[in-house]
Amino acid sequence: MNGVGLDFHEHNQVNYINPASYSSVDSLTFLFDAGISGQISNFNENGVKKNAKNANLDYVVAAFRAFRHMGVSFGILPFSNVGYNYSVSGWVNEETKEDYYTNTYEGDEGFHQAYVGLGYMPVKGLSVGANISYLWGKYNRTVTNSYSNSYINSLSRNYSARVGSYKLDFGVQYTQRVSKKDWVTLGLTYSPKHNLGASADMYQVKTNAMDGSLDTTSFSIDKAFELPHMVGAGLMWNHAAQWKVGLDYTLQMWEDFEKLVNDRSEEHTS
């Protein structure tokens, strides 16, 4: 699919991006698909460049025909992933060059989803479908600021969260023949806004390098994670079942969300 999937449907491929596509699964086939991916990241701060490489199991999915015009799919997909560890150093004051700082950034873990979905074709050319997913995982992020001058306190902040909740996705596809060898498919998807019910925790430690004393602060924000309304639309042209041209557009409505740290953290500081 090469990233285009809202309007894509084939009898021998699993398209979990739009659950309406499951209705096209071949009645004599059990489909199984798995994929891996690699990622190379480049970080640049104050002229210092770092590279990071990682590989992930992208997905494991399957699909089969349950009844006439009805297909079923299930699988495990990544929702997000975090993985980095790098540091940068520089002078606190570029003119005097007496003291320097080191900032260290670390992050790991990620979120995953296990889903099951149905796709049904009530009339020729029109398919509808839905996925229900269980979303789970955790993440950790740490930012540490340290200094060569013992009079300057070092600071470490750790951010963590654990999520376990559901996610819903709905899809529609409509295919219309426009000539003897050409078809056009319109695909639509919608995912409703949903609060994942998980809390976000922050733990801060300020260390005095002279006497080793610690000053700690922590706070937790309840129901800190929400998924926005997500709407997608796509159009695909299929010529003679030999080649396809498609275009997808997805909108995530993040403007409805409050600023998490600025607006809510002060209410939970302890």
PLM features per residue range, with description:
Residues M1-P78:
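N-terminal, post-signal peptide beta-strand-biased segments of exported outer-membrane/organellar beta-barrel
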